[in-house]
């Protein structure tokens, strides 16, 4: 749909929603993201105060996000009344002890819809408005990963299971098209241009098992990464947190990387992280190893990398290590034991493919320094060098 007639699309969706809902009430879970915001605005134009907007505070949002989103949506020009549902304990209990990425996503999805079911019953709503877009459907149906907002497309009957019908005004659009619709609707730029945030939130950026400590460290690291990288205008940029590194050195990778870079092996380290991450192989989901690399000077400090040379190493890795889903480069470390944080920044139009940002090394060093200052339990910071594919944008 390259030549989308935005104004016609908006009118068509408003009329379609009116025809389906009539005088019935509908509920929408708003997140502050462009997809749910556009869906809410279109529906509000169709049925007015019969739309109930809720923000589910699942404990996996960024610092201060619930109140910020409520204030943005309820203010001029949108005037969407938003109710915050505090469901932190419910979601933490649901995901407690889970480490597999798909298990976490599916558990989140079930709790998300149970929460919406309860709110819909309370508000006497039989319809749910969702901001599902085409990329969500493509990735779930192809088996790459389960998007939390996909139901009927994978055989789940929302009426039978949760008691409501689902309306998806944007399911034929890609992200860049949704932004075009948002601009035409005069949605403020802080919402229309907001970078995507996954439905399961930080739960899938705490890679592996979720603990309160890891989640707290990640929230602080996320704030720093968004603050430091924002001026470079990535399409999406964020931090993720891992338990740490596996005690295994990859000597062959270290040797081969040194040969490719034409430097001494003494200046290279290669290893892997403990947790596995999601990737894409032959158009399907893969779940594999995250490889780490460090390029050091004679004193053991990291050096400003040459991205063109790094691409050679990356290509070598994915040609020779089929179990690998990602390659990350050490930005900085401290000697104390602790968690590992990775920084990811990509450029993309449709979110089906993405290129890494070749960020200035000084920007990454500054971000790492601030993370160490704010996160006492973090000991290493890496930068993700992996495009999509072979990696997904998110780690889980």
Protein language model regions, located:
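ATP/NTP-dependent adenylation/nucleotidyl-transfer catalytic domains that generate, transfer
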Residues: 1-396
